[in-house]
Amino acid sequence: MWGSQHRSFQVALWFLVLAVFLLVGFLHVDFRLLIPDKVQEPPVTNIMFLKTHKTASSTILNILYRFSESHNLSTALPEGSRVHLGYPWFFVTRYVEGLKQDAHLQHHFNIMCNHLRFNYPEVQKVMPRDTFYFSILRNPVFQLESSFIYYKDYAPAFQRAKSLDEFLADPWKYYNASVSLKNVYAKNNMWFDFGFDNNAPADMDYVRKRLAEVEQRFHLVLIADYFDESMVLLRRRLRWQLDDVVSFKLNVRSQSTVSHLTPESQERVQHWCALDWQLYQHFNRTFWTQLHAELSPRQLTEEVEQLRERQRELMALCLQDPEPKNLTHIDDQNLRPYQGGKANILGYNLRHGLDTTTLHICQRMAMPELQHMAHMYSLQFPDKTPKDIPFLKK
């Protein structure tokens, strides 16, 4: 009798220990890892991307063009010989090819992603009501440094300054707000792209209202300084497949043209581009808040590595060398990028002997922005005169 009770006690004790063990494990489970991706839901196909300047936005444009072509979607492309949607003027519908000019007509496209100065009422005439709006920002220190090199010969504010350090030491010596349409690249350029006054005082009440406006109209603002993390979040929001957001870096400069600003100059950028700085600071915070709400740290690490691994696989499949090349070392002129200002923009060489399907994929991943835009234009408007890319004829 006593032996039977003893055995029953041992069994009960064993089950109690097991229950405690399972409970501890249960409490430490990250349930977000157990929730599968919503791959069964249809992908988002109505998308407006505000393409800001010098923010890795050319790479995102490539991603959107590829998705548009592979899913047979319509894209709001620049009209006629234009390469932008009216920039730096405010966007209006007449800048879009194939859009009949009728005050009462709304012609909806699936994707809009070329450079424009944001004008929400006009964009609404082009895009469907359920459009997903997103954009991307970059640390203004690095954004302005890139702009200085790229627009050195175009922006009057940059032309006489020997370096960005020299410009920032006394910017009003070089900057004239009255020629703002050419000088937008020299002061609060991202703020300007969102449709705001880049010369406005950085008054807190004004800034707060404009930030609230951006939050109201845009579902997501990405951060170029964390590009891979941005692609992970974008993929989840759009419910796309991994390959849809894998990319090769486009419109990148050689390191020899990158300036390293002094600490004093970096601090001066925060004051000179105060509107851009507050825009960036605000949406850098919201980006990480959204990212951490969506993924656990472990899940984020895994998905970023998954993205990078797939990029390495495609680079090995497509490219002769994963390192981008100078213009003179790019064999195919259709893969030679436009050269802006003092920047040395790099591109890629594809492997020889690729089969037709692989070549199709690789060409589009490596295709520079202007050539890709011309390609999309020919696909969508085969009866119209093809886009002219003058620098390819040199």
UniProtKB/Swiss-Prot annotation:
Residues in compartment: Cytoplasmic: 1-8
Location in the cell: Golgi apparatus, Golgi stack membrane
Pathway terms, separated by semicolons: Protein modification; carbohydrate sulfation
Membrane topology: Single-pass type II membrane protein
Regulation: Strongly inhibited by Cu(2+) and Zn(2+).
Keywords: Glycoprotein, Golgi apparatus, Membrane, Signal-anchor, Transferase, Transmembrane, Transmembrane helix
UniProt xrefs under InterPro entries: Gal-3-0_sulfotransfrase, P-loop_NTPase
An individual GO BP term: glycoprotein biosynthetic process
Keyword Lipid biosynthesis: no
Transmembrane feature ranges: 9-29
Family in the record: Belongs to the galactose-3-O-sulfotransferase family.
General function of this protein: Transfers a sulfate group to the hydroxyl group at C3 of non-reducing beta-galactosyl residues. Acts both on type 1 (Gal-beta-1,3-GlcNAc) and type 2 (Gal-beta-1,4-GlcNAc) chains with similar efficiency.
Protein's name in the database: Galactose-3-O-sulfotransferase 2
Species for this entry: Mus musculus
